Amino acid sequence: MNLFVDTSVWSLAWRRDRPAPSALVKLLEDALAGDDLVVSTGLVLQELLQGFAGPKQRARILDAFSSIPLVVPDRDDHVAAADLRNQCRRKGVQVGTIDGLLAQLCIRHHLQMVSADADFGQIATLTPLRLARP
């Protein structure tokens, strides 16, 4: 599988106070340990770095992301993301700007989204976005 892992799942995986790994965290851990391709984008890296405090956490994030390919949006991705958001809005689903762009990157690069964010489930019902299921 080719997986795009959203900020929500990385955050769950790195929380100190998590009781037990969720099914999505297990999916991430299995993918990283196996032959699955795990990719991300600079926006996710930035959100993670902004959300965790301290030099140890920062170093951990940078180390983990050093081996993860980052997909980079281009002009066409931004245009398509706007179209995706408008399509969803016309059907009553509000999509945030970043979520729209992440969904578009998954669609363009044939990646399955791994996210704990329910908004992506709504996007997937209205667009070609595919969600990875644990």
Q: What are these model-derived regions, one by one?
A:
Residues 1-39, 50-63:
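Short, well-structured N-terminal submotif of metal-dependent ribonuclease cores
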Residues 2, 103, 107-134:
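Acidic, PIN/NYN-like endoribonuclease modules and their adjacent C-terminal/linker elements
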Residues 6, 41-44, 116:
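A secondary-structure boundary/capping signal
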Residues 10, 45-48, 120:
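A generic structural signal for short hydrophobic patches within well-formed alpha-helices
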Residues 34-35, 64-68, 91, 109, ...:
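Structured helix-beta-strand junction loops
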Residues 69-116:
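Active-site neighborhoods of divalent-metal-dependent phosphate/nucleic-acid chemistry enzymes
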